[in-house]
Amino acid sequence: AGARVTFVGHPLADTVKASMSYEEAMMFFGGDRVKKRILLMPGSRKNEVEKLLPAMLKAADILTEKCECQFFLPRAGTISSEFIQGFLKNASPRLDIIVTAGRIYDLMRICTACIASSGTATLETALMGLPTVLVYRLSAITWFLAKHLVRVEYAGLPNILLHKEVTPELLQDKVTAGNIAEVVLLWLTDEVKRQENIRELKSVRAVLGEGGAVRRTAELILRTAEGK
């Protein structure tokens, strides 16, 4: 409508970074150097966790059959420990899984791959260069409306930004333990493929712009207020 627009960048370009070294993070989280370390991020809302965590845990069991794996499950502040434990008590007893809280970017730093709910988490893992498979389930009516009303090719923010699927997406009935494990296993067993994905993810940071978005926004507001 003729308004002037200035792109100042994205605040996540500033905030998404590890505060610990790799060695410090390994010690802090109890990372196993022998095992492949996989991050499970089922979401911050109960309904998300209920729909996604069971499939993630079953996929974790399949992966454990194929190679030595250690899993990390960061608990969102909106989710109680008791709620998470309700799912873990029904998981395979052979799973090596650690529930964590806080320092999520340091945790991402030491992980080999990630299984994450759609949302900001996939943008954060992309900025951290962590290969991630996106999983998400909506109610049947919401999915129907979304398919007919929302005109976007992808669900994941990294894919929307880059106009291609750098973060594999499994939606609705494709969210199965077998499908999830198949994607992740490729990264666990083929380091060349994993590094290719990491290189693609670097483009996300380039699209979001340089750091300093908050500072530039404040400066722009001040200049506008002063009539400059």
Model-predicted regions and their roles:
Residues 1-228:
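Nucleotide-activated sugar donor-binding and catalytic core shared by glycosyltransferases
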